[in-house]
Amino acid sequence: MTEFEQDQYWMQKALEYADKAEQQNEIPVGAVLVKDGELVGAGWNQSICNHDPSAHAEMMAVREAGKKIENYRLIDCTLYVTLEPCPMCAGLLVHSRIKRLVYGAADAKTGSAGSIMNIVKEPKLNHQLEVTSGVMAEQCAEKLSTFFRRRRKEIKEAKRLAKQAAQEE
């Protein structure tokens, strides 16, 4: 299997984990960590469910992988994530010594692997990652867009119902 085919395969797996987040009404981001062609960690956004602002997909996958390989250094691992990491997660990837980051959709608001800043390639830090961006970007971005459209519609409907109930009193 070529690197391109591997990237497609594992990003599809990350999208499946993003579906788990969406089923819990979390922002649909999924991540998988791979070492030597084997899944060693996986996660999806769980910040709302866990009341934990650090429970991003990347964080959950890294925690699981560390336990599985019994090491906090995830050397020679590749992280596949459906959305470009935020500053917190980018820092985590550097500290974890992950070799390679592959992400789908760019994040113009908090993207820290090239969009608004580039923590994962910062030369002042003691580790930099190889980065491949835009893998299955359209599918990843569409999943997020669909989620936020639905969420805005639900919020609008809830406001309408609240206003209607207030008028009936």
Write out the residue ranges for each language-model feature.
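Short beta->alpha transition motifs characteristic of CBS
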Residues: 40-47
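Zinc-dependent deaminase
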Residues: 1-21, 92-169
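Residues that line or immediately flank small-molecule/substrate-binding pockets and catalytic motifs
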Residues: 47, 81, 105
